[in-house]
Amino acid sequence: FEMQYCWSHSGVCRDKSERNNKPMAWTYCENRQKKCEF
């Protein structure tokens, strides 16, 4: 996957685009502007 902007929740970084109505879990994200790596 390429790096995408994400939003964090409970210390978990998730992708904005949801799959099967569930946010995809990514690596830890310290802020909403940070990009997540697969």
UniProtKB/Swiss-Prot annotation:
GO MF annotation, one: toxin activity
Keywords on record: Disulfide bond, Secreted, Toxin
Any Gene Ontology CC annotation: extracellular region
Domain of life: Eukaryota
Protein location: Secreted
Cystine connections: C6-C36, C13-C29
Listed Pfam families: Defensin_3
Gene3D superfamilies: Anthopleurin-A
Tissue and organ distribution: Produced by the crural gland and detected in venom from the spur located on each male hind leg.
InterPro entries cross-referenced by the UniProt entry: Defensin_3, Myo_ane_neurotoxin_sf
Function: Does not show antimicrobial, myotoxic, hemolytic and cell-promoting activities.
Protein name in the entry: Defensin-like peptide 3
Species in which this protein is naturally found: Ornithorhynchus anatinus
